[in-house]
Amino acid sequence: MKLLFVCTGNTCRSAMAQALAEKMIKDNGLDFEVDSAGLFADGHSPASENAKRAVEKYGATLDAHISTPLTLKAVSEADKIYAMTADHLKLLVLSLPELSEKAE
């Protein structure tokens, strides 16, 4: 199963969700792939310092994270898409109505 977390710039919320999910998956020996992207990500920004500090409290890291723009390929490959806010979800489903079944 492949999970995709989506927010605005992929430097905070979705990046943190990815890092924490990857840690939980590894710690529990689960078989999931995890990715994150931003609706308006520029593709070259690091995670915010606050996001880095927040995930470090839980033993995860964002030191190597670089923002990733959302692509149709990422959307089509994901089994489940988690939008970080109701507005992100609304924009996703309005733009790609076929996502309504796998996005929340």
Which positions does each model-derived feature cover?
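Conserved active-site segments centered on acidic
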Residues: M1-E77
